[in-house]
C-alpha cells in the first residue's frame, strides 16, 4: 500500500483515510500501514528528543544507520551513541509510506534532504531495519553517464552468492535491468522495475521516478554516452517473503564508493525493484579515472 502525508497529520489522517487509500498489488495485511506509520512516528520523535531508551526499543537486530556522508553504523554502534537525525522531528517534511507484506518503507524529504526507513514485521511488532540518509546536489550532475560502455560486473558476474531461489531471481532481474541500462534499452530496464519506483541519489539533484529514468536512458541512447553501472563490491540481502532488502557497496569507475539500499518486491510472479537510495561515502578515497 502507498500513502502520502505529513507527520503533523499522522493520527487523524490515518483513521480518516483507512478505507480510501490506494492499493499496491503487493499484498499488505489490513492495518499494517497504520502500524508502520505509528511505529515510525514514535521512533522519529524519540530520535528528535535524543531519547535513546525509547528509540532503541524499535531497532531490529540487523539495524543499520547510514548518514548523509555515507558513514554506516551497526545497531551496536548506534546504541553507544545515537546519531542526530538530519530531518529532526520531520514536522515539516513530506512523508511517503509503502507497505509490501512484512516490509514497510517510509520516505521523508525536505528540499534536497531525504531519509529512507525500512521496517520489518517481527513477532514482537514492527522494527526498524534500515535508516538511510541522502542529501542531493544543488545543481544537476555534469556527467551524462559513467562514460563506460562495457559491463562485466554486475551485468554478467557479481561478487555475491545467492542463498536461495528468491535471491537468485533478484540477481538475475538486477543483471537484466543493468544490461538494459548499459545497452540504452529502456524497455528491457523497465521490465524489472515497479511502476512506483523511485531512485534517490547523492549524485543527482532530484528524485528519479520510473518515467524519469526511462527518459534518461533514451537521452543516453541518442547521445551515445557510456552508461555502464558502477561495479558491485559487496552485497547483503535480507529476505521477508515477497519483499527483500538488498544492501550494497558499489565502486564507480571513477570517484568514491557508494552505499546503496534497494527494496525488491515480488509482484505478479516476478521480482522487481521498488526503491533505490544511494549515498556516496565521503570519507573513502576516490578512485582515479
Name these PLM-found stretches:
Residues 1-7:
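Positively charged n-region of N-terminal signal peptides that target proteins for export
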Residues 8-21:
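Bacterial N-terminal signal peptides
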Residues 23-61, 129, 135-191, 195, ...:
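Short, low-complexity N-terminal intrinsically disordered segments enriched in polar/charged residues
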Residues 35, 76-116, 214-258:
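Surface-exposed, charged secondary-structure patches
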Residues 43, 54-55, 63, 78, ...:
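Hydrophobic pocket/interface hotspot
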Residues 59, 69-70, 109-111, 117, ...:
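A mature extracytoplasmic/lumenal domain signature
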Residues 114-155, 257-284:
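Short beta-strand edge/turn micro-motifs at domain boundaries
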